[in-house]
């Protein structure tokens, strides 16, 4: 099962792309954060807009920062805690924008 082309159009308009289908009913979509983090989001194909909405709603900025702060300056991770925080906030906004745009599609 694949996502409908109308959803792919929304993804492309916001610089997201379909990365892969997992074979178990999920799809991986990808984008890059302002600081260059490779974001790969895995959600259900069925009810795709709702799945993205739930992922965006549940994305925890603090948890994301905690995961990265111990790797500051490594492998492309920003060395500044402030930049990591700002980037995590931007990721949350990217996810919310994508979710909102997908939910508007009829």
Question: Where are the language model's segments positioned?
Answer:
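Charge-rich, solvent-exposed alpha-helical interaction surfaces
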Residues: 6, 10-13, 64, 87-101
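Negatively charged, low-complexity tracts enriched in Asp/Glu with abundant Ser/Thr
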Residues: 1-37, 75-81, 103-106
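Intrinsically disordered, low-complexity regulatory segments enriched in Ser/Thr/Pro
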Residues: 36-87
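Generic alpha-helix signal with a bias toward terminal, lower-confidence helices
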Residues: 23, 28, 53-57, 96-97
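Low-complexity, intrinsically disordered/propeptide-like segments
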Residues: 14-17, 42, 51, 71, ...
